[in-house]
Swiss-Prot record:
Any one GO molecular-function label of the UniProt entry: NADH:ubiquinone reductase (non-electrogenic) activity
GO cellular component: plasma membrane
Catalytic activity: a quinone + NADH + H(+) = a quinol + NAD(+); a quinone + NADPH + H(+) = a quinol + NADP(+)
Species of the source: Enterobacter sp. (strain 638)
GO-annotated biological processes: positive regulation of potassium ion transmembrane transport; potassium ion transport
Protein name as annotated: Glutathione-regulated potassium-efflux system ancillary protein KefF
């Protein structure tokens, strides 16, 4: 099962993320949890989230880039849900054998994320990748949709279809 942890602070105002979700919500074996709709007060039900993760083979962190990072609620979700003794540490093996995909949208172009002489997007992924690897998750190459503020609808739809295909390809590889 694919579990999409969707973290858009203003989901009704989304253009790119909405199209991405519209493409994948019709797939078999996909569950979408919209954090800002579930937890507008930031009071995360840790047990419910851990139960959802336990059913998943692939976890997708889908969100818009905000100041070169994740939205606040996704960061809090990781901090709370990936708890010691469950996700890492002594007896913390709940995530081992699962995969994670970072699916992010940006308003700027890919070159906008170059930081000095460093390839910015790879640098920006490092905290999430380090968290994933520390918890025993397999880190998959990220999916990024850039320039979403200036893309026309046709381009956004094409990118959303590409996202859907990434998930279909993963399902085909892992479900035989």
């Amino acid at each position: 099962m694919i579990l999409i942890i969707y973290a858009h602070p203003y989901p009704r105002h989304s253009h790119a993320n909405k199209r991405m979700l519209d493409q994948v919500k019709v797939l078999d074996g996909v569950e979408i949890r919209s954090l800002y709709e579930l937890y507008p007060d930031f009071n995360i039900d840790i047990a419910a989230e851990q139960e959802a993760i336990s059913r998943a083979d692939l976890i997708v962190w889908q969100h818009p880039m905000q100041w070169y990072s994740t939205p606040a609620l996704l960061k809090l979700w990781i901090d709370k849900v990936f708890s010691h003794g469950w996700a890492y540490g002594h007896n913390g093996h709940a995530l081992k054998g699962k995969s994670v995909l970072w699916a992010v949208t940006t308003g700027g172009g890919e070159a906008h994320f170059d930081i000095g002489s460093h390839p910015g997007f790879e640098v920006l992924a490092q905290p999430l990748q380090a968290t994933a690897l520390y918890c025993g998750l397999q880190w998959l190459p990220p999916f990024a949709m850039h320039c979403t503020f200036v893309c026309d609808d046709e381009t956004l739809q094409a990118q959303a279809r590409h996202y859907k295909q990434r998930l279909l390809d993963w399902q085909e590889t892992h479900n035989g």
